């Protein structure tokens, strides 16, 4: 049996080498060796770890931070640098952020788009109808570094995380309701007596989400996101076998989206994942569901972010308009006051007689 370069390098590593460092070596050799099949198989092997609820939540954390990246790149980031928050190549860090790689830091591998000129079988460039050389996009392995591996100019980032307070609760709820309204999904609140065992439910026949009254703000939003995932991204008719996977799908979207919004996710658990995947040797179902979780969470997060911006801009416009009205009212009051003073004659008091001694 041939021994791969990565196996040789792994054998040379100290015993206390971290799992992430070993992953970097394996992935680097598979990616730069153009072994796409081997890389995909290696990443799928990581699915076995997600049967553990805590490990699965850590993976969802990575999706939350990098929801606009491809599924493959999310897997690569999670395997090599699960605590990453913001990544870029060394050149990008230098030129765009004036930051530099810390001495001794090692990058990790992801895939990035690269433009190339198209050639024919004879090696000549192919021209388009305008006589220009045709170009295409391919994805190549590149080295990136997390912000924690860099130093330099302080970053001024617009954080997407929101504190879970009343003001932001109202904004987020408005955004979610607007998204639901576009699909004619009704949202109603019901008494706890009518929903004693659940926080929420979705009824496909009525296209209605029911939420239990009296929940905390974070629970209300997370439950609404969970039920919205059922309503927007799942089939209206499901089999008993599909139920567990559908709950995993909706629960995962709720976790990823809530995490993105800065809501508390500590109460959320995935115990049913362990029971569903128990004794399974084939992880095809889980792989398929994670693909859907990634694409649907990305879609919902982007919709929420866009709608939140609109909600906030409306409030700013409203505040400006309200201020304008208030200023106009004050000016009007001042004018009325001035006119009143001009119209009213000076009040003269009768002269008091001089006191006699």
PLM regions and their residue ranges:
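N-terminal accessory/interface modules of nucleic-acid-binding and processing proteins
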Residues: 1-339, 344-348, 353
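Conserved ATP-binding/catalytic motifs of P-loop helicase motor domains
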Residues: 355-357
